[in-house]
């Protein structure tokens, strides 16, 4: 009876929705500090809560490095409260009709569309990417929400009647319980939207930890989810760094962890979370190669290389950071440089900007050091963006488009993921040599080949050991009816993000063997031998 009453309350809550987010954000508050810098709240039990923490992290505008907010490192008590809220909400949410959960997401995707530009503005302010790119960030996440609305078919089980006389076998998918997500700074909307909508539509409750550098988009997305009718406690949000990550990895009530970020963090979370008996999926670093054949459409290929290498200032796990020029295609290098020179570097909210700043001064320093390593190890810098100055934003973390040629696979700038607006260029004589270079690299997130020859494209797609391959498509991120299938050192776990695999990750199978005898008779004696069923 209690479960029925709780489920009825959930359904009533789902029907009480508003159509617009409030104009004044409820997830920011007036600062408790002496300055006027706002502080970011936690989201626990359906309420935006001011943290009692004495540890705070500054949020900077990467274009100016001014402090625009502060985010708390949640206390142990606050993190425990968030988990307790998830745990309390789970039974009623799991018992809620899948159609009702679907209705929440149908309303949610509409509210995201209506507030897309507001979310994008927050992303540009905190992360630095251009407004157009920020809108793309939100839109690609929205596509996953839209796909999650297909849950009624995606969660279907399997049935086999009459496996033997009067006996049927069937299986269905059930939610795991409390799941958690740890998101990176580079996609403040898309990556969280890969996580909690898929988990929640399956009947799980969710604990989200956005990047402490870019919390604003996730907080607005939480408000929109609440306005869509999601019951209190089904989504909770904490903030923090190492202590919050360890808390998520160790807490016994968390059943699964989704992570996107660096290799160092991903390996750590995968090992620690797995050690504590959790499912873990971890998307990590990359070194994505674009192989250019001499028969490719030159103008189209050059534009695609430049856009995929330098868009978002190279801060994408699917950035095309390495070009492999095959045969006569090496003659295109001067034109490649000219195309890159035409890109406009500016603050993300400025009209006409093609790429914005890097996320922090430390990120800029690391990128510049990797460029330096190329010159020290014998590479040539054809285009150098290290000394770029953006008028009016002299304190920003800007690096302009940079192209390094004569790169060899043993060089540091090739071996490490740069995560900046830097394209390293290698040259080979044959396609087979290019394939060998790609396959010898430990990463397996994405790759692309540019050619007008179908046989060449097919050979490359079949022989290259990379999880996602583009043919004349520089950033082959699958649409959400498929799954994001990075591989090798770019991924840890056995089930990928979104698509069918996303549903599998957030659910568990239950199989029922049922017998109703036609004669409705009782056994005359106990059956003590192993049932063979098929005889």
Curated annotation (Swiss-Prot):
Enzyme class: oxidoreductase
Described function: Malonate and methylmalonate semialdehyde dehydrogenase involved in the catabolism of valine, thymine, and compounds catabolized by way of beta-alanine, including uracil and cytidine.
Quaternary data: Homotetramer.
Similarity comment: Belongs to the aldehyde dehydrogenase family.
Source domain of life: Eukaryota
Native species: Homo sapiens
Organism placement in taxonomy: Eukaryota, Metazoa, Chordata, Craniata, Vertebrata
Keyword Transferase: no
UniProt-annotated location(s): Mitochondrion
Chief place where the protein resides: mitochondrion
Disease: Methylmalonate semialdehyde dehydrogenase deficiency: A metabolic disorder characterized by elevated beta-alanine, 3-hydroxypropionic acid, and both isomers of 3-amino and 3-hydroxyisobutyric acids in urine organic acids.
Effect of residue 535 to C: In MMSDHD; uncertain significance
Phosphoserine: residues bearing it: 262, 380
Originating gene: ALDH6A1
Binding of NAD(+), residues: 183, 185, 209, 212-213, 262, 417
Repeat among keywords: no
Chain positions found as N6-acetyllysine: 47, 52, 55, 76, 87, 117, 129, 298, 330-331, 364, 376, 500
Residues modified to N6-succinyllysine: 47, 52, 55, 76, 117, 129, 364, 376, 391, 517
GO cellular component terms, A-Z: mitochondrial matrix; mitochondrion; nucleoplasm
Annotated consequence of substituting residue 446 to R: In MMSDHD; uncertain significance
Protein name: Methylmalonate-semialdehyde/malonate-semialdehyde dehydrogenase [acylating], mitochondrial
Keywords, ordered alphabetically: Acetylation, Disease variant, Mitochondrion, NAD, Oxidoreductase, Phosphoprotein, Transit peptide
């Amino acid at each position: 009876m209690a479960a029925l009453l709780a489920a009825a309350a959930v359904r009533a809550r789902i029907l009480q929705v508003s159509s617009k987010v409030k104009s004044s954000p409820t997830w920011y508050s007036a600062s408790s500090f002496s300055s006027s810098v706002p502080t970011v709240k936690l989201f626990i039990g359906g309420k935006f809560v001011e943290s009692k923490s004495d540890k705070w992290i500054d949020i900077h505008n990467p274009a100016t490095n001014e402090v625009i907010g502060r985010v708390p490192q949640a206390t142990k008590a606050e993190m425990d409260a968030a988990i307790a809220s998830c745990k309390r909400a789970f039974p009623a949410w799991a018992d809620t009709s899948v159609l009702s959960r679907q209705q929440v997401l149908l309303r949610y995707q509409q509210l995201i569309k209506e507030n897309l530009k507001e979310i994008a503005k927050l992303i540009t302010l905190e992360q630095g990417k251009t407004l157009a790119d920020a809108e793309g960030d939100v839109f690609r996440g929205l596509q996953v929400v839209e796909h999650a609305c297909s849950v009624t078919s995606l969660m279907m089980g399997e049935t086999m009647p009459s496996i033997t006389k009067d006996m049927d076998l069937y299986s269905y998918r059930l939610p795991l319980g409390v799941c958690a997500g740890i998101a990176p700074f580079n996609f403040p909307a898309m990556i969280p939207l890969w996580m909690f909508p898929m988990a929640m539509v399956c009947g799980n409750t969710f604990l989200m930890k956005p990047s402490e550098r870019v919390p604003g988009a996730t907080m607005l997305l939480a408000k929109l989810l609440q306005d869509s009718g999601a019951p209190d406690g089904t989504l909770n949000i904490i903030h923090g760094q190492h202590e919050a990550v360890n808390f998520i990895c160790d807490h016994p009530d968390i059943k699964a962890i989704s992570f996107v970020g660096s290799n160092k963090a991903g390996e750590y979370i995968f090992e620690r979370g797995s050690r504590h008996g959790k499912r873990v999926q971890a998307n990590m670093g990359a070194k994505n190669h674009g192989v250019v054949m001499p028969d490719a459409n030159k103008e189209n290929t050059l534009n695609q290389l430049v856009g995929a290498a330098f868009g978002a200032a190279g801060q994408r796990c699917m950035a095309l950071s390495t070009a492999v020029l095959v045969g006569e295609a090496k003659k295109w290098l001067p034109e490649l440089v000219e195309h890159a020179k035409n890109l406009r570097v500016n603050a993300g909210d400025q009209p006409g900007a093609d790429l914005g700043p890097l996320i922090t001064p430390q990120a800029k320093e690391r990128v510049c050091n990797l460029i330096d390593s190329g010159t020290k190890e014998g590479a040539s810098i054809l285009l150098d963006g290290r000394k770029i100055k953006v008028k009016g934003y002299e304190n920003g973390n800007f690096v302009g488009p940079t192209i390094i040629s004569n790169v060899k696979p043993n060089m540091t700038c090739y071996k490490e993921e740069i995560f900046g607006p830097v394209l390293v260029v290698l040259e080979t004589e044959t396609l087979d040599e290019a394939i060998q270079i790609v396959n010898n690299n430990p990463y397996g997130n994405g790759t692309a080949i540019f050619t007008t020859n179908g046989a060449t494209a097919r050979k490359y797609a079949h022989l290259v050991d990379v999880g996602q391959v583009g043919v004349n498509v520089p950033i082959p991120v699958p649409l959400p009816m498929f799954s994001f299938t990075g591989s090798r050192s770019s991924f840890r776990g056995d089930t990928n993000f979104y698509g069918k695999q996303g549903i599998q990750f957030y659910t568990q199978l239950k199989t029922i063997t049922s017998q109703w005898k036609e004669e409705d008779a009782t056994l005359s004696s106990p059956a003590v031998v192993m049932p063979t069923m098929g005889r």
